[in-house]
């Protein structure tokens, strides 16, 4: 997982509330378990509308999604996180996320930032008025900054530490690989063992 410290990029204003994971990536995309190749499935139904915000040329290459409240509701699927990342989003800002989606995001390296709805509104207005306006998401300072906007956000210390250090569940476990190997070597032969790949 790539470490996240500070990211600056253009924003996509997604003025929709209650966006569920099936809208983020439809179920027929869930046939594989690799983490890549999902960008075309992101908001697939909505992207059929030529006026959808992601179809606009000025939004190409934007890397911060500013979403409406209750983003990521519905079923738990890491594919929704992977689709957002594959498209190029490094952070998603909303006034409220579904807990399971937020947990999946943080464990996969996608920073989800909770801000007051008034700040989300200000970011929408800024990015709609000027599609080239940049938004900085600073995890070290726990702050979002844009032209005329500075907002602090909270994130639990464990999730913050893992993101700052680029540690997912597997890499966190592998930090103790030598201890695990020593434990396995000392176990009696009649007990189950881990087999090297």
UniProtKB/Swiss-Prot annotation:
The keyword Amino-acid biosynthesis appears for this protein: yes
Catalytic activity as recorded in UniProt: (2R,3S)-3-isopropylmalate = (2S)-2-isopropylmalate
UniProt cross-references to Gene3D superfamilies, sorted A to Z: Aconitase, domain 4
Sequence similarity: Belongs to the LeuD family. LeuD type 1 subfamily.
Recorded superkingdom: Bacteria
Subunit structure as annotated in this protein's UniProt entry: Heterodimer of LeuC and LeuD.
Entry keywords, A to Z: Amino-acid biosynthesis, Branched-chain amino acid biosynthesis, Leucine biosynthesis, Lyase
Known function: Catalyzes the isomerization between 2-isopropylmalate and 3-isopropylmalate, via the formation of 2-isopropylmaleate.
Pathway this chain belongs to: Amino-acid biosynthesis; L-leucine biosynthesis; L-leucine from 3-methyl-2-oxobutanoate: step 2/4
Enzyme Commission number(s): 4.2.1.33
NCBIfam families for the chain: leuD, PRK01641.1
InterPro entries documented for this protein: 3-IsopropMal_deHydase_ssu, Aconitase/3IPM_dehydase_swvl, AconitaseA/IPMdHydase_ssu_swvl, IPMI_Swivel, LeuD
GO molecular function: 3-isopropylmalate dehydratase activity
S-S bridge residues: none
Name of this chain's protein: 3-isopropylmalate dehydratase small subunit
GO BP annotations listed: L-leucine biosynthetic process
Pfam families xref list: Aconitase_C
Coiled-coil stretches noted in the UniProt entry, renumbered to this chain: none
GO CC terms in record: 3-isopropylmalate dehydratase complex
């Amino acid at each position: 997982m790539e470490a996240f410290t500070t990211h600056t990029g253009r924003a996509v204003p997604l003025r929709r509330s209650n966006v569920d994971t099936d809208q983020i990536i439809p179920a027929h995309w869930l046939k594989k378990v690799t983490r890549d190749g999902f960008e075309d499935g992101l908001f697939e139904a909505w992207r059929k509308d030529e006026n959808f915000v992601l179809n606009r040329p000025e939004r190409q290459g934007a890397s911060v999604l500013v979403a409406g409240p209750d983003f990521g509701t519905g079923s738990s699927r890491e594919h929704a996180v992977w689709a957002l990342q594959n498209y190029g989003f490094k952070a998603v800002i909303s006034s409220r996320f579904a807990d399971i989606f937020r947990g999946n995001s943080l464990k996969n390296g996608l920073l989800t930032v909770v801000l007051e709805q008034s700040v989300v509104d200000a970011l929408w207005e800024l990015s709609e008025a000027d599609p080239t306006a940049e938004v900085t998401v600073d995890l070290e300072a726990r702050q979002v900054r844009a032209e005329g906007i500075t907002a602090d956000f909270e994130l639990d210390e464990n999730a913050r530490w893992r993101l700052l250090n680029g540690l997912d569940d597997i890499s966190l476990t592998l930090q103790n690989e030598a201890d695990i190997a020593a434990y396995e070597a000392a176990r009696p032969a009649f007990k189950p063992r881990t087999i090297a790949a």
